[in-house]
């Protein structure tokens, strides 16, 4: 398959080997581990449902369509052979499979940059329920 689109896209694997897979494999992902990462961003990602240490890392695992849209994840590559989870065909279009990898196109993503109304500054992510945090982000 040859990709014929904008080279500025974000993707993630469903099962990472390390928290730095985007860096190791040179792709634009959301997972990160860095001593330079802002703790507040790590806190926010944790409250949004990402796995992390709440200090300087957060790791992508299968997420909700809301999270994937908000963080502009254009492609999800399912490489978790042990999982029975299915990608919902309403949200994701199966592109191709090769070996243990199956690539999906996210049908609903927001652009990498977009404008929100002024009320976003009152949004709080201090909640232990990631579904409520994600819902509050879109209200």
Question: What positions do the PLM features span?
Answer:
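Short periplasmic/luminal acceptor-recognition loop of GT-C membrane glycosyltransferases, typified by
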Residues: 2-39, 104
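Short amphipathic alpha-helical surface micro-motifs
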Residues: 13, 57-60, 84-89
